[in-house]
């Protein structure tokens, strides 16, 4: 019996029940039909629920896209409004992320309009976590524009805050050997919480370098694994830092490899661009795809790419921007390091850093470098438009870290 025949019987039963009871059809026909109808209703219900699920998912995606678009619009407005009110001197000051000076810390923040301070070992000596929170709050209160407060916190041999912790932060390599990636990520979460609790909003990690030689300068600071595992490590650490709104910095682009120490020497790296693409670029690309905030460029000279240190090389900057499609903040390694300081003067280095396309200058010579850059703007060697490009990226990073929340 077809569906339509059975449906007709059901209607007839409803309209003339006595007739059908008398004829005994109810007993023969209705029971199987009710079962048949029940299954149709179940299937129909499942189809309806599936449709509703997909509809709700589409609505959620649409809401998320609108929220993202609204957030980006809000960020752009905050950045552009702040940029429009800044003097040239304030803009140039934003290009400098400085070591905390031995004296006049508050005065220099106000006089030079610095983008922020980087804390080193001496800044933690004799302090408690509460002391550091008070100190960073004083720095923030003294600055018209919210500050980047950073500290090298890779773990192991490179950690500043560990000197005042009961349990120092270990290196990623040690953690990976002890407990795999979960141990590394657990450490990253804890580190982010501690840093944020004392007002440090950027930890200058993770190290994205590869080194095959265990005696290489950078080896102990890496996770000590191949390009694929290192890429996974970098990606996941960046994501952990994002959750806590602690800034991430991938270093040291374009990859240290097995080379010497640019703190003490000019380093020349003879690897080709193809060599770097096949291995060293992979962790950096993974970090970029995960949303890394910033990338630190080394002073190593990649002889097959350029004749100058990477930190002042337009070609290296172009690789980051165009090939790896990085949109965030590009900073230099410390300009006081011999790998650059023995190559070019401090003041000229600052100019070359910005002309190469970088955004943030790390170092301690800002008292002469800032006036030098202002002079170069006056002479036409450096344009305010070029400065604005970098300041926009720096302010956008500060917005993403939630630093403008306190000042609006």
PLM regions and their residue ranges:
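Second-shell residues forming the walls of enzyme active-site clefts
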Residues: 87, 125-138, 229-375, 382-386, ...
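N-terminal Sec-pathway targeting helices
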Residues: 23-39
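Glycine-rich, aromatic-flanked loop segments that form ligand/cofactor-binding clefts
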Residues: 140-166, 187-208, 230-254
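Short, acidic/polar
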Residues: 100-110, 184-192, 278-283, 344-350
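DNA-contacting surface of Y-family translesion DNA polymerases
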Residues: 70, 74-134
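Hydrophobic faces of well-ordered beta-strands that scaffold small-molecule active sites
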Residues: 92-100, 115-119, 147-153, 203-206, ...
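Mid-to-C-terminal alpha-helical segments outside catalytic/metal-binding sites
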Residues: 378-406
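N-terminal, intrinsically disordered, polar/charged segments of Gram-positive cell-envelope systems
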Residues: 16, 48-85, 91-93, 408
């Amino acid at each position: 019996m077809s569906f339509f025949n059975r449906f007709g019987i059901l209607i007839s039963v409803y309209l003339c029940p006595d007739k059908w009871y008398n004829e005994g059809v109810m007993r023969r026909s209705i029971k199987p039909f009710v079962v048949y109808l029940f299954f149709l209703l179940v299937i129909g219900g499942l189809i309806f629920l599936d449709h509703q699920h997909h509809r709700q998912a589409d609505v959620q995606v649409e809401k998320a896209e609108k929220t993202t678009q609204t957030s980006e619009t809000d960020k752009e407005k905050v950045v552009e409004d702040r940029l429009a009110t800044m003097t040239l001197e304030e803009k140039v000051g934003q290009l400098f992320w400085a070591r905390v000076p031995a004296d006049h810390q508050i005065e220099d923040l106000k006089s030079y309009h610095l983008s922020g301070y980087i804390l080193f070992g001496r800044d933690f000596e004799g302090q408690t976590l509460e002391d550091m929170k008070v100190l960073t709050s004083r720095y923030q209160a003294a600055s018209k524009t919210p500050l980047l407060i950073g500290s090298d916190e890779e773990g192991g041999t490179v950690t500043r805050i560990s000197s005042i912790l009961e349990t120092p932060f270990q290196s990623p390599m040690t953690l990976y050997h002890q407990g795999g990636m979960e141990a590394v990520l657990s450490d990253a979460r804890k580190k982010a919480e501690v840093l944020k609790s004392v007002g440090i909003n950027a930890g200058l990690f993770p190290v994205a370098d590869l080194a095959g030689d265990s005696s290489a300068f950078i080896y102990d600071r890496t996770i000590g694994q191949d390009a694929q595992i290192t890429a996974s490590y970098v990606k996941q650490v960046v994501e952990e830092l994002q959750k806590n709104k602690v800034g991430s910095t991938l270093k040291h682009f374009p990859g240290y490899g097995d080379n010497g120490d640019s703190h003490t020497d000019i380093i020349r790296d003879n690897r080709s661009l193809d060599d770097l693409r096949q291995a060293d670029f992979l962790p950096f690309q993974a970090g970029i795809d995960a949303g890394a905030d910033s990338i630190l460029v080394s002073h190593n000279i990649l002889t097959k790419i350029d004749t100058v240190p990477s930190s002042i090389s337009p070609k290296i900057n172009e690789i980051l921007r165009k090939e790896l499609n990085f949109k965030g903040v590009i900073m230099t390694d410390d300009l006081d390091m011999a790998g650059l300081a023995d190559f070019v003067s401090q003041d000229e280095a600052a100019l070359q850093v910005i002309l190469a396309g970088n955004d943030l200058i790390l170092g301690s010579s800002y008292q002469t470098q800032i006036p030098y850059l202002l002079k170069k703007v006056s002479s036409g060697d450096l344009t305010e438009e070029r400065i604005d490009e970098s300041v926009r990226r720096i302010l956008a990073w500060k917005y993403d870290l939630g630093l403008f929340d306190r000042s609006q």
